[in-house]
Each structure stands twice: as structure tokens, then as C-alpha cells.
């Protein structure tokens, strides 16, 4: 008895397609992070931590905190100095290690709080901040767990997502804390040197990555943020519009990103954050005026 010949089957590509659908963004993050590490690893980890802590030690000693390391100048607003003081009194090597560890913890906490896939830890701006020991990675988890005032002292622009997400209590506490601590912080020196410090920031960031690096993108960014809705614009506004942004500023955008927007904002080129906001806005498909108004209408009580 003869059996009919079986038709030869090609490889089943469904599993391959499913794997690509699930992990393409992880691979993209991994490639960019590996490229960034290949550059960063030629130097010493923790540069930002050293700069921040040296500036804080200078302030604690009664000197001007706007110091230089190599060609990089500390130019953050005075409130940044206060939460770093307990770390600055540690031996330098330990202080730098603590700053790097906190940056790693901040990235992990963000992934856990937002319930993102584990591979989001590879998001290149997380890596950039962690390698440099920059406190940027702490902002998002601090805001999300109700410690927004501490985030605002670390980086003053944290007040923008706090305001747009209606965290009134956090804003009131922040304002009160800024008033109470103002006499102890070097605001006079900062204001007197504001022009020079702003120029230093612009030089050190090569003009930044936000729309301010390409001014014709500014109206595009505003329009895209409008159509993205208030909740998403809250997290996207700093990467898209804040002057002289650096790559790790994009960590604030994570709660609002779609996969495609995340892939774009992971690229360290001027205007990428604006393109990401446009993608989020298009995905929202907010075309009616009523829906747009509803997206921006404040809640009654806001958030803590």
C-alpha cells in the first residue's frame, strides 16, 4: 500500500514573529546601550557624582559651588546642594559609589512602579544617568511615591510634571521648603552668575536635545504636547521643551511613551524627544475639541 507523499512544510515563523513583536524594543534598547557603554567605558564611572559632590563640599565649606572638573562646570540651581549634603560628607570614593547605586536603584524602582517589562532597565537614558551617578533616575520614582518635593530639590524642573499631574500638596510643600531654605543656599551667587552658568550648560550639552536646540521645533512641540493630553504632556514636557537638556532627562518621559515613541526618544539626537511627543499625540487621535478640553480639564482634588 502506498501512502501519498507529504507536502514539505517550511519553518513555522509564528514563534519568530511573536518573539520579535515582544522583544524588538528590548533589542533596540540593548543595541543603543551597548554602543553608549563602549564610549563611556573608556572613561571613569561617576563623573556627574564627583562634580555634584565636589560642588556640595565647596558650599558646605563656605565657598562658591560653581566649580569646574576638567571642562565641566557645576551649574545646577542651589536647591540641588541640600539633599546631596549627607552624601558629600562621606569620603569621595564612597560618595560616588552611593550616587551610582542610587541611580541604579532609581531606574529599577521606575520599572517596578510602572510595572514595565524587566528589559526596560536597558532604556539608554537610565544607563547614561546610572553610569554618571546622576540623580536624574530618582526623580520619577520620587514623584510617583509622593516624595515630589525631594525630586524638585534634586532637579528643579521636576515641578513641571508635578504641576501638570495636579500634585498640589507636593507643590505647596516644595514652595514652602524653597522659602525656608533660601537664606541658607547661595541664591545670590547663582543669580549673579546666571548668565555664565546658562552658557556653561548650553556648551556642555552641545545646545541640548529638546526643541530649544532647533527653535523651529518649539511650536511643533507645544502643539504635540497639547494633543497628547495633560497626563502625558506632564511627563513629556521637560524632555521636549526644557532648555539644554541632556540625554538622561528623557527618563521623565517613560510613563507617557508608546513603544515607537520610546524607540525614538532613546536616540540621543536633537529633536528626538519632539518626534516622540508627536508619535504619542498621533496615537491619542484627539481630534474633537470636547475630547481635547476633557484631556486638559483639571481634576477636582488632584493628587498628593
Regions found by a protein language model. Give the residues of each.
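Primarily membrane-embedded glycan-assembly and transfer machineries that use lipid-linked glycans
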Residues: 2-145, 167-304
Amino acid at each position: 500500500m502506498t501512502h501519498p507523499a507529504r507536502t514539505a512544510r517550511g519553518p513555522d515563523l509564528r514563534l519568530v514573529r511573536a518573539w520579535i513583536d515582544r522583544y524588538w524594543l528590548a533589542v533596540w534598547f540593548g543595541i543603543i546601550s551597548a554602543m553608549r557603554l563602549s564610549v563611556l567605558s573608556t572613561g571613569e564611572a561617576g563623573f556627574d557624582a564627583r562634580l555634584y559632590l565636589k560642588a556640595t563640599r565647596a558650599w558646605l565649606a563656605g565657598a562658591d559651588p560653581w566649580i569646574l572638573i576638567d571642562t565641566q562646570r557645576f551649574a545646577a540651581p542651589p536647591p540641588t546642594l541640600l539633599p546631596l549634603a549627607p552624601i558629600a560628607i562621606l569620603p569621595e570614593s564612597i560618595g560616588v559609589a552611593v550616587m551610582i547605586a542610587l541611580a541604579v536603584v532609581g531606574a529599577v524602582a521606575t520599572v517596578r512602579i510602572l510595572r514595565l517589562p524587566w528589559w526596560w532597565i536597558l532604556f539608554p537614558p537610565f544607563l547614561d544617568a546610572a553610569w554618571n551617578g546622576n540623580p536624574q533616575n530618582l526623580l520619577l520614582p520620587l514623584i510617583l511615591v509622593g516624595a515630589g518635593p525631594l525630586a524638585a530639590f534634586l532637579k528643579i524642573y521636576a515641578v513641571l510634571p508635578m504641576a501638570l499631574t495636579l500634585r498640589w500638596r507636593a507643590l505647596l510643600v516644595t514652595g514652602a521648603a524653597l522659602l525656608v531654605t533660601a537664606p541658607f543656599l547661595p541664591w545670590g551667587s547663582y543669580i549673579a552668575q546666571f548668565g555664565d552658568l546658562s552658557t556653561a550648560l548650553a556648551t556642555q550639552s552641545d545646545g541640548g536635545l529638546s526643541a530649544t536646540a532647533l527653535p523651529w521645533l518649539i511650536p511643533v512641540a507645544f502643539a504635540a504636547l497639547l494633543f497628547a493630553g495633560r497626563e502625558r504632556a506632564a511627563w513629556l514636557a521637560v524632555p521636549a521643551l526644557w532648555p539644554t537638556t541632556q540625554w538622561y532627562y528623557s527618563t521623565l518621559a517613560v510613563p507617557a511613551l508608546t513603544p515607537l515613541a520610546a524607540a525614538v526618544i532613546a536616540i540621543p539626537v536633537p529633536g528626538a524627544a519632539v518626534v516622540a511627543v508627536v508619535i504619542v499625540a498621533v496615537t491619542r487621535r484627539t481630534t474633537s475639541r470636547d475630547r481635547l478640553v476633557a484631556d486638559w480639564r483639571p481634576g477636582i482634588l488632584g493628587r498628593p
